[in-house]
Amino acid sequence: SRDGYELVDIANQFYNKLLNDKDYDLADKWTIYVFPEVNQDGLANGWTNNGPGRTTLYSQAPNNKGIDMNRCWQIGDSYTRFTSNRNYNGTAGFQAYEAQALRDFMLANKSQNGQTLLVDLHGWTQQLIGNEEICSYYDRQFPENNKKSVGRYGTGYMIAWGRTYLGSTNRAAKTALIELPNQGVTGHQSVVNGNFANRYINATLDMLKNMN
């Protein structure tokens, strides 16, 4: 779960950058929601990246087993089940309370007649996944990342669900998952040395300024 703190720190740096820059043009163009910490129990009390910590600690699944929050986003009536400790996703979609809350918030706050963008930040498999246009901005900052999954949206992934359900009356939602690099990453200092936070922030701001 310590890995999660690095992602929370990057999200908080992005949030503070938005506050400090006071970019009113950007504020007029977008309503920006930042979720630094969606698996709070896993972050605080988890103990492994292949089970509790990566997954939630409690859910509506049988025996209240924790859920991989990026495998439980059901689309329509079909649901692909994952049973490993690393990717366990219950017996039906949204058995993680945290995923339910995030889903409901996004549905309530998606654009009604404009463009919704969804960027899901993860570590550390060094990939760009999802919408080609969004991924192009992160490719400029993370050229070492694998691009084989650009244009793909995974099974049970939040970005697949978002692409399906967060569109407006006029425009389809655009979604992507950014997996931070793993090369040379051994702890917090290597994340700092790799300038991951600034690279992520610069890519995100560039995307927001140039996409419509």
What are the residue ranges of the model-derived segments?
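Cysteine-dependent hydrolase recognition
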Residues: A99, V150, A203
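Secondary-structure junction/capping motif
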Residues: P62, D68, Q95-A96, Y153-Y165
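A generic structural motif
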Residues: K29, N146-Y157
